[in-house]
Regions:
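Catalytic cores of DNA base-excision repair glycosylases
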Residues: 2-198, 202-211, 215, 283, ...
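Intrinsically disordered, low-complexity, charged terminal extensions of DNA damage-control enzymes
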Residues: 1-18, 23, 186-347
């Protein structure tokens, strides 16, 4: 196959989206944008990106940020392990590299939360290094371009695609080339629905287009079934109209984040909820059920039963705090898993 770079780059320079991390592609900006975009659409991530940079304009500021403020800046993006790893990496960068990301692929790859793709994006876009940056968009483009039925989630297949990506990469324009492939996959060689082949600069070279197999590609491994977990969520409110929050364990699902009272296992009845509250030293003065809800994580689905409970005046149990509505809005971060109950909390 002839080299795709000339046609691809010509298309990219004419059609690329104007994005803040492209107009000012400092290593920190590219790093932050790539972490945010791992599980979030560009349009949804942009307001968070701007707000985050306004509060934490450089790596030392990120490294020094208090945990609650950091979580609050990330609130709404989900997958909070991303921002925890972001801060862990920032602290290492401050300790070992003077607060500036290293211009070295392997050194970037060694930082928490930075994998092959993110290291390649930073290294090529910000530092001009001739390295690959292969994400799902790029794998899809090359799967169709070569009409390759390989399962792209398999490591050996991904390595083979990466080698093909590098065969076409112009070393002096590595960052632009990598971004162009990502952009082509995002705007033209799209994942859902028919690809926009008539707009593609590589249409004349695309083997899947000739074979009529573009809609069938790429091939992925079948996803694992999610585990269903019933949980009971309790919005406990005291006489001062404060809500009880408990902090989750520092490891595992939603690590270290705040949540309403929650019990895992079979859905609890109102009587069982009151009994558990009394065991915590909280008197159940009134209780009413809330609508059932669910939340899907990558590997777990919560089926939530909810109750709103008035408990009068009481000390917060161990591991819990009372939080006013104002504090809930400005200080504490509740994960998106509790979206169905946020209106009741005044959020």
């Amino acid at each position: 196959m002839e080299n795709i770079a000339p046609a691809l780059l010509e298309w990219f320079y004419k059609n690329q989206r104007i994005l803040p991390f492209r107009t000012d592609p400092t290593p920190y900006h590219v790093w932050l944008s790539e972490i945010m975009l791992q599980q979030t659409r560009v349009s949804a991530a942009l307001p968070y990106y701007e707000r985050f940079l306004a509060a934490l304009p450089d790596i030392p500021a990120l490294a020094a940020c208090e945990e609650e403020k950091l979580h609050k800046l990330w609130e709404g993006l989900g997958y909070y392990s991303r921002v925890r790893n972001l801060q862990k990496a920032a602290r290492i960068v401050c300790e070992q590299y003077g607060g500036q990301l290293p211009a070295d692929y392997d050194a970037l790859r060694a930082l928490p939360g930075i994998g092959d793709y993110t290291a390649g994006a930073i290294a090529s876009i910000s530092f001009g290094l001739a390295v690959p940056a292969v994400d799902g968009n790029v794998l899809r483009v090359f799967s169709r371009l070569y009409n390759d039925p390989g399962v792209i989630t398999e490591p050996a297949v991904k390595r083979a695609f990466t080698a093909r990506v590098m065969e076409h990469q112009p070393p002096e324009k590595a960052g632009d080339y990598n971004q162009a492939l990502m952009e082509l996959g995002a705007l033209v060689c799209v994942p859902n629905g028919a690809p926009l082949c008539e707009q593609c600069p590589l249409a004349s070279l695309c083997e899947a287009r000739r074979a009529g197999t573009a809609l069938e590609l790429p091939h992925k491994a079948a996803p694992k079934a999610r585990r269903i977990e019933p949980v009971t969520v309790v919005l406990a409110e005291d006489a001062e109209e404060r809500f009880l929050l408990q902090q989750r364990p520092q490891k595992g699902l939603l690590a270290g984040l705040w949540q309403p009272l929650l019990w895992e296992g079979e859905a609890l009845s109102a009587e069982e909820v009151c009994a558990r509250l009394e065991a915590l030293g909280l008197a159940c003065e009134s209780i009413e059920p809330l609508p059932a809800a669910k939340h899907i994580f990558s590997h777990i689905e919560w089926r939530m039963s909810g109750y709103s409970v008035c408990v009068g005046s009481a000390e917060a149990p161990a591991g819990c705090v009372w939080a006013s509505r104002e504090q809930l809005q400005n200080e504490y971060t509740l994960p998106g898993a509790f979206k169905a109950y946020k209106k009741k909390l005044g959020l």
